[in-house]
UniProtKB/Swiss-Prot annotation:
GO cellular component assignments: cytosolic large ribosomal subunit
One of the protein's GO biological processes: translation
Gene Ontology terms for molecular function: mRNA binding; structural constituent of ribosome
Family: Belongs to the bacterial ribosomal protein bL12 family.
One Pfam family matching this protein: Ribosomal_L12
Keyword vocabulary terms for this entry: Ribonucleoprotein, Ribosomal protein
Highest taxon, organism lineage: Bacteria
Source species of the chain: Fervidobacterium nodosum (strain ATCC 35602 / DSM 5306 / Rt17-B1)
Record note on quaternary structure: Homodimer. Part of the ribosomal stalk of the 50S ribosomal subunit. Forms a multimeric L10(L12)X complex, where L10 forms an elongated spine to which 2 to 4 L12 dimers bind in a sequential fashion. Binds GTP-bound translation factors.
HAMAP family reported in the protein's UniProt record: Ribosomal_bL12
InterPro entries: Ribosomal_bL12, Ribosomal_bL12_C, Ribosomal_bL12_C/ClpS-like, Ribosomal_bL12_oligo, Ribosomal_bL12_oligo_N_sf
Function of the protein: Forms part of the ribosomal stalk which helps the ribosome interact with GTP-bound translation factors. Is thus essential for accurate translation.
Protein's UniProt name: Large ribosomal subunit protein bL12
Amino acid sequence: MTLEELVKAIEGLTVAELAELVKMLEERFGVSAAAPVMAAMPVAGAAAPSAAAAEEKDSFDVLLKSFGAKKVEVIKVVREITGLGLKEAKDLVEKAGAADAFIKQGVKKEEAEEIKKKITEVGGEVEIK
């Protein structure tokens, strides 16, 4: 299997499968996928370029903050959006509010807004990052 074939295979995985893959790799190689924490504060002048980069951002992550009173309805919408199975969608919805409760990652602004609209219509709450 070439690296290109491996990348294509990974692209075809669901969010739940990717999370499981990361967990397996962490266990197998004894590493952590957590980002290192910056020890020093950034310089004041460095804030301006990051603000400009945020305006040009073309890839967004949709994070589930809460499922509200209609958990079952939110699960149905999450399944529709992600293509996850019932158990995986339920597990994702039950993680609402966690730092890794992403419905979708790396989507365009229009798609992120559409996901937010669908989830809020059934009583859920999302954050677009």
